[in-house]
Amino acid sequence: DLEAEFKEKPVTQDPNAIEEDRGGVEVPDGYVYDPSRGALHDYCTNSPDQFPAPGVNADFSGACAIHDMCYEKDYGNADAMVACDTAFLKNLRTVCKAVYTSALDPRLSGCLNTADTYYKAVVAVHPKNYFR
């Protein structure tokens, strides 16, 4: 039932979710999670909201929500959108480094590579912001 699926709470709003998995990058209070409203209201759109790893998953929902809100506020302003993308990468990497704290932990490099891929995907979807 599609309607029931949209009524489910996302993992980051679940009271049982572990805050440390978000690395201090929280979903802003004003964020509206509603995929029926489009890509700016569904966390990480067509990508997983978490970096899956043995043990603890790094939760990117906060970073994606902040990026969604930034784009919604500044859509059409190329310079502002580039700043949104830069902050997005920083937030994703912050989550990775907070969740996987040892440089020797292979999950850290995997998470950082995933963060870079998410950033590159966003840039690829909006090339006009970069090539003007």
Q: Model features per residue range: what roles?
A:
Residues 1-132:
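Extended terminal accessory/targeting regions
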